[in-house]
Amino acid sequence: MDENEKRLLRQIDAFVKRSHEGILRDMKTLVDIKSVQGEPAPGAPFGTGPKRALEAALEIASGMGLFTRNCEGYVGYADLPGKSEKQIALITHLDVVPEGSGWTGDPFCMTLRDGFAVGRGTADDKGPAVITLYAAKFFKEQGVKLPYTLRVLFGTNEETGMQDVCLLYTSDAADDTP
């Protein structure tokens, strides 16, 4: 490992330590939203839960200084502009399946248990969505201009039909850049 790689690892470690509480706070914000598919409503094609989760994720991303867009409630995204309009998209989703039985606590109230975040969506896929945003935030804070635009996509219908992803192929969302 050369000195540049060692320095980068130190920067990442420092960022993770500094961001730990924010990561947990933002995960809790999303996990605490019951984003199970519901009845369609204006701006909420998969129900109000997925809509609220999408709005919350976009608010978190906007607070990090990322460019955000809500594509009619189907999908949203947060961009970290790069040196070119080419994009690398990191796909996440904010909808969850119904909680089912076997929970010892409220599945829509994230808690920490033995050092682990517990709640519906912590692993699939709200937790990874938050971590992906923090990766973009790391590059932004470091002043790194990637050779491409980094786009974090937030789906709202992965668990029950993937109709959100279809929007990417039928609209300008895939080509739109800030």
Language-model-derived ranges and their functions:
Residues 90, 115-159:
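Alpha-helical metal-binding/catalytic segments enriched in His/Glu/Asp
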Residues 28, 58, 130-137, 166:
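Predominant activation on well-ordered alpha-helical scaffold segments within soluble catalytic domains
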Residues 77, 97, 159-161, 177:
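Flexible, glycine-rich phosphate/dinucleotide-binding loops
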Residues 169-178:
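Single conserved hydrophobic/aromatic residue that forms the stacking wall/gate
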Residues 102, 162-166:
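Short acidic, glycine/serine/threonine-rich loops at helix termini
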Residues 83, 137, 175-176:
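Charged, amphipathic alpha-helical interaction segments
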Residues 2-120, 141-146:
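Acidic/His- and Gly-rich active-site-bordering loop/insert found
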Residues 7, 127-130, 163-164:
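Residues forming well-ordered secondary-structure scaffolds
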